Amino acid sequence: MQNGSVLSEVLAQPGATDSVFDVLAASVRSFSQGDRVGILGFAGGGVIAPLRALGGGHRLSGVDLDHAGYELFCDLSAGWMGAVQFAQSDAVEWLHSQRGKFDLLLEDLSVGRNGDVFKPDVSIDTLPRLIQSKLKPSGVTVFNLLPGDDRTWAEMTAKICAPFGFGVQVLFESYYNRVLVLGNEALPPAREVSRLLRAELTAIGSEMAADISVRSLRLGKR
């Protein structure tokens, strides 16, 4: 953890992390209508243990500039990780190169500086429109939003949401992170999203079931 934000967590077996990763996994499980999921910012694959515990059999493709986290993940998770592909690459270059469209893209990039962790500029200025172009019509993206270096929450949220017509945000009592769930087609109301996520989190015994609140995002419908 840095600056109140969890960067990665690797478990030796499927199960809850009792952290933001459980909510990311529950979001993938709840909103991916197919099984093709991309992870931008793989790190140690922290989302995969709770996702597999939830019964999510998605085909996962991850990208990260650093290979070390993936190696650790494989050492601990080879017996149960399921279909996982990894590329050591720049996230924008990798996503540009991908053929076909994704059911869900999870954006989990971060950059560390002086002991703190921030959202990189590319996550706010470049990736939202690229991600939108790489999603199926019914596809959804999940952004793990961290504090900005020199941007407000409102500015970051507005820029990330701009290409999308529908969305909700998940807030935490215990973490600075905010999770944005965005799509081109209508999502359930915030109250229903809260119920869906809490049900998934409760199913794996995650403490996050009592830690989250879900709010609507007012977006310009496309």
What are these regions (language model features)?
Residues 4-8, 110-116, 141:
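A short, flexible beta-alpha/helix-coil linker loop
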Residues 1-2, 22:
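S-adenosyl-L-methionine
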Residues 142, 164-175:
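Conserved S-adenosyl-L-methionine
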Residues 57-59, 81-83, 138, 164-165, ...:
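A generic structural signal for alpha->beta connector loops
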